């Protein structure tokens, strides 16, 4: 057994150095656990940060926005408003549709929210209209969250009604059952129905009314219990031909007798098989289609969900006729997988670059292998903990591991460098490992816990941003902690077995050249440091100027929230004049689709026209533009959007709003543009007064572009002003008037056809093809008290007015949402400040309130907490360092290096044209942890030299700087090269990764140069300060 010199205890590493087999098996267990954990980790774009969101949709065909608001939306809102945990409630009431979106607190489980919503709907049921075709339907999805998959079902030979029927019963239901699917919507509105189009003149000629026809149809088609006969020996179930199944049966239905002769429905109406709603349509690449949008449940694994759907599709399509084609138009997981693959490649590249820089400095293969093992072991071991914490493989956790590459190698480098120094002095490898590891153990612990302390404030960030970066911070902290364990166990053990004087002294021509170069650099640094120490006040002036510059740069740098990603999918809204009909919108979307599909970057296009809840009004259309993969097109998404808007701008009567879909969706409604700002009042009249003023003011701001609002109060309305006295004299009630109008113009669902597989509706309406517009009202006839018929014009006057197309509420009060984008020459911070200044200029009254929504609101919250977040990181690190060093002074010396990192990061972001968004801010916070490592390594050795060798503070810090120059340079370059692949990334998701890389590379470059000189000077300054305090207060003998 090798005899160890006195003092070679090895500290916490001793047991692991002396027991190599146990150490090896322990590390193998960590490696195996990480590999197994990796296989169980789900893949996602970002960590799960969705608010629990539930959407409640109620359809009431024919109802005006005002009726939908008062009769449907308001009763529901009153019940929903009593739910605990509700964060925000928004609603949109339009013609025939009410949509209430409920966003709950992040801490409320979605299942609990679902139970509360169901109870509220049940409580409101008695307050809703009795003739609602269907009760309110809720779904656990965020309507603003883009679908994870879009499929188009087309056929060249079959009617779309048959196609939808098959899709609904054979395909959509099966997809809905897939784990993780929150909602499958069918856009296209071609659900089969029997349509009864009354000939108003024929009905009037026979002395009948539409109400007579409706009553006859509803009475002829029933499906109710009829009982059974229970005899002494046999039981018999009663059935009857009370159901009519086809248009032919309805056509033969007798609705009245005229002079003893039967009047059949076919005599006064056109009865045909058609669509339930003829004012809905969807197109895929200009071909009529049924478009299936699949949305995930909040919290669901998007990759696993999409994979399950794709595995199911071949079996589902086999059940359809050959003429029916199912095409996957978009799959968000394609870009998610590509982004994760690119980040994984950057992670491997970072590992390779770090190992390369280690070899460049050590120029020794055994010495390079040791950290080459420590780095992947630390990263792979992290996967085991990630599984335990229910994390996922996503862009942020992979970015954390990529950055961790530069962090985790630092510990191994510090240990190897210190042990190698003793071996080169002639000590045996085992003794050198014990002595070097024991000497450096406290430094490793200081580095680790001070770095983790920087991440602690990230764990306590509130709301959506805190949820977003929790996985990032914990993953990085776990990797750093495992690295410290590996560096104090495996690394010294391998040094004791793999390093020797011969291996370290063995040099080739390249090694000798590198050694001479490093010696010259160290000598130059020594001369420069001596001059700096002789002129401390000049150096302190530079340090103070750096602090001031960092503050100035922080003030002037453009600020943003989250990078705009290129996911290859563009959401669009097509807006037309408020009086536009369905037919005119269908024609306009064809013109727009033709222009869009001509663009070389566009792969496919789906468009939708009509009111279905998701699309609020007839004068708007939804578009989804799917771009070719990034490597198959020349331009990124913003350039494509600009080109498409230019192409469509020449089409008269339309406005096209486009925005790229994002992985991070905070909004609760589909917006025309990226950012939203709301104006809320207690009454609609107050809104109508202030909306135009604020919109005009916002449109004049250069910091905003594409400003629009959802306020639409110029829709055409026919006001039926009934003379109640005349109507009462004739025995006609207002209910009779409403029913007659509803029967004629509401696409009224008057009866249900039940089959074994589905239910279909009977739709009643007037055939208005020959009498369009207000002239159709002249055909309405009502039954008087004596049984005769009276024209509507006899008791009512028709007035044409303007009316709102939709009525929006936020927390039960009327609201208007302004949508806007930010031009490239401005930042989101500029736009937010400009809006706030405009609001002050307008001097809005007290009953008018404004609020940013969605990502803009989150930006405000994040911006307000950023400074406090950085302060909290610094304070946390000070506390940890103070505890470790048992000193109030030395932590300040270490933290004095931080402004240099801020200056470098902010300058790099400005030069690169990047905003200071939350990704870049995280980079700056990480820099706080990295940069202070330089000071820790210097101060640790200086204190040891003063304590053990009796050196003066100046000699001690000078020697420490020269001895630690090489490991400082090595660790800084390792961290820099770990971030370099992120800065230079060009693939899918690069918008997310580049700000972090830019901030870290810039901060490391500047801080490396400055801290090597400022830290020794500040160390000596505080040493003098400490001596001064001791001389003035001699009773306090404790060391500061």
From Swiss-Prot:
GO annotation, cellular component aspect: plasma membrane
Entries under Pfam families matching the protein: ACR_tran
MF annotations from Gene Ontology: xenobiotic transmembrane transporter activity
Highest taxon, organism lineage: Bacteria
Membrane topology: Multi-pass membrane protein
Compartment list: Cell inner membrane
TM stretches of this protein: 15-37, 345-362, 367-389, 396-418, 438-460, 472-494, 535-557, 867-889, 909-931, 968-990, 1000-1022
Keywords, in A-Z order: Cell inner membrane, Cell membrane, Membrane, Transmembrane, Transmembrane helix, Transport
InterPro entries, A to Z: AcrB_DN_DC_subdom (IPR027463), Acrflvin-R (IPR001036), Multidrug-R_MdtB (IPR022831)
Subunit structure: Part of a tripartite efflux system composed of MdtA, MdtB and MdtC. MdtB forms a heteromultimer with MdtC.
Family: Belongs to the resistance-nodulation-cell division (RND) (TC 2.A.6) family. MdtB subfamily.
Stated name of the protein: Multidrug resistance protein MdtB
Organism annotation: Salmonella typhimurium (strain LT2 / SGSC1412 / ATCC 700720)
Organism phylogeny: Bacteria, Pseudomonadati, Pseudomonadota, Gammaproteobacteria, Enterobacterales
């Amino acid at each position: 057994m090798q005899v160890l010199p006195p003092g070679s205890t090895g500290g916490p590493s001793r047991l692991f150095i002396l027991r190599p087999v146990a150490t090896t098996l322990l590390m193998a267990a960590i490696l195996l656990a990480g590999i197994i954990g990796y296989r169980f980790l789900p893949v996602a774009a970002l960590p799960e940060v969705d608010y629990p969101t539930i959407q409640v949709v109620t359809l009431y065909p024919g109802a005006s926005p005002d009726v939908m608001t008062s009769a449907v939306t308001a009763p529901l809102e009153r019940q929903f408003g009593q739910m605990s945990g509700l964060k925000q409630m928004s609603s949109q009431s339009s013609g025939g549709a009410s949509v209430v979106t409920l966003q709950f607190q992040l801490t409320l489980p979605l299942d609990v929210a679902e139970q509360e919503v169901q109870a509220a709907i049940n409580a409101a049921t008695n307050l809703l209209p009795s003739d609602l075709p269907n009760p309110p339907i809720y779904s656990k999805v965020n309507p603003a969250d883009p679908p994870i998959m879009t499929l188009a079902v087309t056929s060249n030979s079959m009617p779309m009604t048959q196609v939808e029927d098959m899709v609904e019963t054979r395909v959509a239901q099966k997809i809905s059952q897939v784990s993780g699917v929150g909602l499958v919507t069918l856009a296209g509105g071609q659900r089969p129905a029997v349509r009864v189009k009354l000939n108003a003149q024929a009905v009037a000629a026979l002395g009948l009314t539409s109400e007579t026809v409706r009553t006859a149809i509803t009475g002829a088609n029933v499906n109710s219990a009829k009982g059974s006969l229970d005899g002494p020996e046999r039981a018999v179930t009663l059935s009857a031909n009370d159901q009519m199944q086809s248009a032919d049966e309805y056509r033969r239905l007798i609705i009245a007798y005229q002079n003893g002769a039967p009047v059949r429905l076919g005599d006064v109406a056109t009865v045909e098989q058609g669509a339930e709603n003829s004012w809905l349509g969807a197109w895929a690449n200009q071909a009529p289609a049924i478009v299936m949008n699949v949305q995930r449940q909040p919290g669901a694994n998007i990759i696993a969900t999409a994979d399950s759907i794709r595995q199911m599709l071949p079996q589902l399509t086999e059940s359809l006729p050959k003429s029916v084609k199912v095409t996957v138009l978009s799959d968000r997981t394609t870009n998610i997988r590509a982004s994760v693959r690119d980040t994984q490649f950057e992670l491997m590249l970072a590992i390779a670059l770090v190992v390369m820089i280690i070899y460049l400095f050590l120029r020794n293969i055994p010495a390079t292998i040791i950290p080459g093992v420590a780095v992947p072991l630390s990263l792979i071991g992290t996967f085991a903990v990630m599984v335990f914490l229910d994390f996922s493989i996503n862009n942020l956790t992979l970015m954390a591991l990529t950055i961790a590459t530069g962090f985790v190698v630092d510990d191994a480098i510090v240990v190897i460098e210190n042990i190698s120094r003793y071996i080169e002095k002639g000590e045996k490898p085992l003794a050198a490992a014990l002595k070097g590891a024991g000497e450096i153990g406290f430094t490793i612990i200081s580095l680790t816990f001070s770095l983790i302390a920087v991440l602690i404030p990230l764990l306590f960030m509130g709301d959506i941003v805190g949820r977003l970066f929790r996985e990032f911070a914990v993953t990085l902290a776990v990797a750093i902690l495992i690295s410290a364990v590996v560096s104090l166990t495996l690394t010294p053990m391998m040094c004791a077995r793999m390093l020797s004087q011969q291996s370290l002294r063995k040099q080739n021509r390249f090694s000798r050249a590198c050694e001479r170069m490093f010696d010259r650099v160290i000598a130059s640094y020594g001369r420069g440091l001596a001059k700096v120490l002789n002129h401390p006040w000049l150096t302190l002036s530079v340090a103070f100027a750096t602090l001031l510059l960092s503050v100035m740069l922080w003030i002037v740098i453009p600020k943003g929230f989250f990078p705009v990603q290129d996911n290859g999918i563009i959401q669009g809204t097509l807006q037309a004049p408020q009086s536009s009909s369905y037919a005119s919108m269908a024609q306009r979307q064809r013109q727009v689709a033709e222009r869009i599909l001509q663009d070389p970057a566009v792969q496919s296009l789906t468009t939708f026209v009509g009111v279905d809840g998701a699309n609020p009004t007839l004068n708007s259309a939804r578009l989804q533009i799917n771009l070719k993969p990034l490597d198959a097109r020349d331009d990124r998404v913003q350039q494509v959007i600009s080109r498409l808007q230019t192409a469509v701008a020449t089409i008269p009567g339309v406005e096209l709003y486009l925005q790229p879909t994002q992985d991070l969706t905070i909004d609760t409604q589909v917006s025309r543009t990226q950012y939203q700002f709301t104006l809320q009042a207690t009454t609609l009249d107050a809104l109508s007064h202030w909306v135009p003023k604020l919109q005009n003011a916002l449109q004049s701001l250069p910091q905003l572009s594409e400003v629009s609002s959802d306020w639409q109060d110029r829709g055409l309305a026919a006001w039926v002003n009934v003379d109640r006295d005349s109507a009462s004299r004739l025995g006609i009630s207002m209910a009779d008037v409403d029913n007659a109008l509803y029967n004629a113009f509401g696409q009224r669902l008057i009866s249900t056809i039940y089959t074994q597989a589905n239910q279909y509706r009977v739709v009643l309406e007037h055939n208005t093809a020959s009498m369009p517009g207000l002239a159709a009202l002249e055909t309405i006839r009502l039954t008087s008290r004596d049984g005769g018929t009276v024209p509507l014009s006899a008791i009512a006057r028709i007035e044409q007015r303007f009316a709102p197309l939709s009525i929006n509420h936020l927390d039960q009060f009327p609201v208007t949402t302004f949508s806007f984008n930010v031009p490239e020459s401005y930042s989101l911070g500029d736009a937010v400040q400009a809006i706030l200044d405009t609001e002050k200029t307008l001097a809005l009254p007290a009953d008018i309130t404004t609020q940013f929504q969605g990502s803009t609101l989150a930006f405000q919250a994040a911006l307000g907490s950023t400074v406090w977040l950085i302060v909290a990181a610094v304070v946390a690190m000070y506390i940890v360092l103070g505890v470790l060093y048992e000193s109030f002074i030395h932590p300040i010396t270490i933290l004095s290096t931080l402004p240099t990192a801020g200056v470098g990061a902010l300058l790099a972001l400005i030069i690169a044209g990047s905003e200071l968004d939350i990704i870049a801010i995280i980079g700056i916070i990480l820099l706080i942890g990295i940069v202070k490592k330089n000071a820790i390594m210097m101060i640790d050795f200086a204190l040891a030299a003063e304590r053990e060798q009796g050196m003066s503070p100046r000699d001690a810090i000078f020697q420490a700087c020269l001895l630690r120059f090489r490991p400082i340079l090595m660790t800084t370059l390792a961290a820099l090269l770990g971030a370099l692949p992120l800065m230079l990334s060009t693939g899918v998701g690069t918008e997310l990764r580049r700000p972090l890389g830019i901030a870290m590379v810039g901060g490391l470059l500047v801080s490396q140069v400055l801290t090597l000189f400022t830290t020794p000077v500040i160390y000596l300054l505080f040493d003098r300060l400490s001596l001064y305090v001791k001389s003035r207060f001699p009773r306090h003998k404790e060391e500061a």
